[in-house]
Amino acid sequence: MQKAAKDYELDESLIYAVIRTESGFNADAQSDAGACGIMQVMPSSFEWLQQVRDCEGKYTEDDLFNPEICIDYGSYLLKYFLDFYGTETSAIAAYNAGFVVSDWLDNSDYSTDGVTLTDIPYPETKEYVERVTDAKAKYIELYYS
């Protein structure tokens, strides 16, 4: 996690919080939706990220169960969303729900400025953002303060 945090200029506590929320640190986790590994990366996202990173076909879906690979790609995806959306809340929401976050930001019911989410219409994603945010705060309190 330290390597990924350094490589992608991410707060370690954010990576820990996503892992805690996604898999409870279970490298063999697989969701009913098909997300794999310690950071629960979707195989379709993994394929897309390999294309984005110019390493298409380097890894297979099974490689998502390798914690080092999954943390690298999951962290890269988090950084991608942070850069794309500009706020941690939107990035965390996108990690869970994908690019639909763009629609929410364009809707005045969910964002007053097109940048900051004031509400999240998917209950699962809303709870997910709260859980990750709470876990991050706890990690900061326990290990970084």
Question: What do these predicted ranges mean?
Answer:
Residues 1-145:
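Catalytic glycan-binding domains that act on GlcNAc-containing polysaccharides
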